[in-house]
Amino acid sequence: MEEGDFSGSEPSEVTDGQNTNTTMTTETHTTTEHQPKPLVVRLLEVHNCDEDEEDEEEEQEEDHEAPKTHKSHEASVSFKSVNSSDSPKASDLPLSCKASDFLGSSKASDPSESFKALQSSESQEDVKDDLFSNAVIRTSPSLMTGYPPQLQLTSLRAHPATRDLVKKCFYSRKRVQDLSRPKKQWGTPDRRLFWGNQEPIRPVSEAALKAPSSKRIEDLAQPRLVSRHYVPNRVQYYYSCGRDSVIWEIPPPALITQPSKRIQKLAKPNRFKTQSLINRENLPGTLRYSDPSPRILRLSIAKGTDPNYIPPKTIQTKISFSTLSAVASPRIVDLAHPRIKIEGLCYERERSELPIRPVAPAALLANPSERTIFLAKSKRVHEDYLPVRDARWPISYAATHPQVSERIQELANPHTRSPTHVVYYDPDVFKVKPSALKAHCSNRVKELAEPIVR
């Protein structure tokens, strides 16, 4: 599509439904080279058309309904292309004046009244559209290309509710961007903290910041002079804020040197303070230290060793000089070496029937003596020895199939006790029968009474 197509204008026709063909041509010359009028010029034109408003309203009432409809449609087109048109016609001036009047009335009145007026104007336009349902509107392409993409001021003036919504959305964009960012972790500072960049807890006054320092403060602010003979043996930190402390390293000569007698004397603690020794003579007699008695002096002497005391023998073994100077023979040196095993702990087996360790042929052919045979036999167990019983042992058939006698049933019944509310004393409770005193236990009872020896 070329630029020449948009330079021309196409006529816009409106046809009513009462078989009346009325053609009105509106030519608007809008090109990309022409710029819209400034805002000040358009405001002056609106102000000038306020005076002729009454005359034009009377003329509009006398006109036919068809021109009214044409004007309404033409007003909608001219309202959308106010900024794009250079020379508006006389028919467009009343409509622009009406828009300015509507804007002024909306500023003077409440927002609710302006909104009602806007609804009434929209309802009138809907009624007109219903009356002329067969109307056809044609718009030239030049108007479409000349319309700027941004929002027009006239549209915002005609609709105050839309203007407030646009302002609200425009100013809330920064808030939406702030909320879209991720939250920072609580407690983490925005910047790294170093010594000297923290804000004070209490604000410093301007007088304190502007106060001149005295000569004494300047002298105290100077660092202490260090002797040229001083050699630091650790890392020097003026401020230890945020740094680890350094342990002093002790040089090796300090560990080897011995202190002098003077240093040893000064290292000992004083038994009494000097002031207490001076004031000691002025103390009363009750507080003075008394001299030791002869008994205390005698007890303070350590006891001597008894003349008949024999000290313990020394455990140290005395080795003779000849033993220390003896020279071992080659055979003794050979026997002193540990026995070397083949392949660690096992020996090579020639045949499977041979033992793991090889046996000498002389040992296999040797005849043992009677003493060796006697010692080779294992010791016998004592006749009364009972082997340790297993944790689980089989239960006999008689124990698994018992038959309860009448006596056992009688003993199985619980003992009947007399009621507690009846007081009964038996005088012969602890009396032993004479027959029980003269009874003799049988050998079987004695045997059962003895514990089993395991």
From Swiss-Prot:
Residues 1-129 are annotated as: Disordered. Keywords: Repeat. Residues 19-29, 76-87 have a biased composition (Low complexity). Residues 50-64 have a biased composition (Acidic residues). The keyword Repeat applies. InterPro entries: SPMAP2-like (IPR042401), THEG (IPR006623). Pfam families: THEG (PF14912). THEG repeats lie at residues 167-185, 207-226, 253-272, 286-305, 322-341, 362-381, 398-417, 435-454. Residues 9-18, 106-122 have a biased composition (Polar residues). Residues 65-74 have a biased composition (Basic and acidic residues). It comes from the Eukaryota. This is Sperm microtubule associated protein 2-like. It comes from Rattus norvegicus.
